[in-house]
Amino acid sequence: GSECEIIDYYVNQDNTLFQRPTGLGSAAHDAHTALHYGPLKARYERFEAFSRENLNISGRRYQSLEELRQAELPYDVLLSGSDQIWNPKIFPDGRFDPVFFGAFSHKRKIAYAPSFGIPRIPDGMEEELRTYLESFSHLSVRERQGQGIVRDITGKDVPVVLDPTLLLERTDWAAAARDGGAGRGYILCYCISRPDALAPYIRRLAEETGLPVVQLCGVRQKVHPKARCILSAGPAEFLGLFRDAAYVCTNSFHGTVFSVQFQKPFFTAVAPAEMAAPESSRTFSLLSRLGLGERIIGKGDTADLTAPIDWAAVGERLGRERKLSLDYLRCALEDRPHTPEEAPVKAEERPLPHLADHTHCTGCTACASGCPKDAITMERDREG
């Protein structure tokens, strides 16, 4: 194994995410915060406690590239990832943050599941990105769109690996879970944006099952008139709420992840931009690889409300993807070439593809996003 430490890099624009309120007076500008000050403060404290107990964070906090350059860092290898750390649009100046490319050190660098979060690199930034990427001994990405970006910039084919939350087994997450305070057997709704597309599913599930609705609040709009809102959940309670749910409705990627991890019947909604360009969507990418594309609302082939999920098949696919991702990580840490293992298929047993007439293609991308083997790719041509 390897000893790991998280560099406490403090990005200024994130300084209010879990900022400790100093009192009701300082929160008075936000009526919602003031009204729910107690539960929100409890949530903040639970996040802090969970971090202290479960994460090995550097003793010093760094707030700039220059501070990191001047520090005498004890690391042998730097690992960057995951999430949208390579998306220039999330930073105030619209540029890449060199820290997330390890530009402060000449030590060996590894990338695990970073995301660009955008369909293409802004004009004039390709050379900068090429310089950053060429400093890595091992590269991987979280979505197929990122794979294409790296190929276009560097000429390299890099693996698409699982989000880190999927590298652990269900039992690992269950061990970290605590009672979420909602009992057992309910419809859990976890929304990080307006629940518009989910609302009809939530109503119908509540009517047909008679189960109560519990809202793990990520937005200020109630998903159901009788929903019980929980604002105080920290990471451990968050896990407990997924563990103890009967159904899950979500528009969050990680809400989808933990529905899969705890094997809960679920429906997930994606943003209109993701629906229009599923190749850029981490939710489409994950669920298509697991054979769960029909759990996405609005695609035209959404599963029936009470349709069962073949969790044995999902578990087999997830186990295979997890092994490939862990193999990449081990090779990267040991500085070995990464050669993905593939099950051998005899030529005579491999069926030839049946190609449809291209004039019948509407460009909806449903076949590509729903293929359980992730065997279909689509590219634009002069006809669309």
Segments the model singles out, each with a brief description of its role:
Residues 1-350:
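Active-site anion-handling motifs in enzyme catalytic cores
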Residues 91-92, 368, 382:
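Short, solvent-exposed secondary-structure boundary motifs
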Residues 151, 372, 377:
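A short local structural element in Rossmann-fold oxidoreductases
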Residues 341-363, 375-384:
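Ferredoxin-like iron-sulfur electron-transfer modules
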Residues 363-370:
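C-type cytochrome heme c attachment motif
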